[in-house]
Amino acid sequence: MKIFPAIDLKNGKCVRLTKGDFKSVKIYNENPIHQAEIFSDAGFKYLHIIDLDGALEGNLTNLDVVGKIIKKFNFKVEVGGGIRSEDSIAKLLDLGSDKIILGTAAIKNESFLENCCKKYSGNIALSLDARKNNIAISAWKNQTKIKIFDYLNIVKDYGISRLIYTDIERDGTNTGPNFENSYKIADNFNIPLLISGGISSINDVNKIIIDDKKIEGIIVGKAIYENKIKLEIAALHLVAAWNVFTHQSHEKHVLETRRRMSKVTDFITVSKEKSKSK
């Protein structure tokens, strides 16, 4: 299973919201590049980046920061937030993004989603962000009457490469994800699915693995930033997954993870010392 640590960008900083409420914004790192470095050194292979300013304004706003992260680190990065045109998609793919996340533009215009899936085959992810099964758009500020499963039945054959389902009422709350809806999506639609919103502990991760519902992975935000899920534990879950898929030595992967975690500890120590000296 893939674990995507999340970096949400606002005013060039790494932040988290609660239930998508911009009044609840909390800064976790002034420097998103440093945050990406922490995730990279911990051994994560995937990264979820959302441009919150872009989502609000309807265009790419933090493109420079996104580009620097992609260029500096060896993540497979999925990027979303304010992507409403093919020009924006092309720019992000040129930077090296692995997946482009469409939300508002896709919900408003199904033909746009279909055309993008054809033109950028394998690169388009669809974000389904909902309150009580009704999809929300425009940085989650506008609630539609469109039901998740009704919409999926329309677009299921477009060639979407990934679905991202977020229960907005759980996002940033550390109360656990909406397993019921997540599993229903996984069971009824043959599209790789990432679960987002409310992942609270390693127990949530274990449940998804044990339940074996064809989930591609999870997106984790506040639970990692607030040490509900410790980096080293999440990384060890990745080790187990790599072992299953590559049939390589588990001991070898554990040693590699410990080496990387040592680098993370050193990095955090140096960062704290630098902060004290300022």
List PLM regions with ranges:
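Conserved anion-binding
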Residues: 12-23, 97-171
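Glycine/small-residue-rich loop that forms an oxyanion/phosphate-binding "nest" at active or ligand-binding sites
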Residues: 61-116
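Catalytic cores of alpha/beta
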Residues: 77-96, 180-182, 186-214
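C-terminal helical cap(s) of enzyme catalytic domains, especially alpha/beta-barrels
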Residues: 112-119, 206-211, 220, 224-238, ...
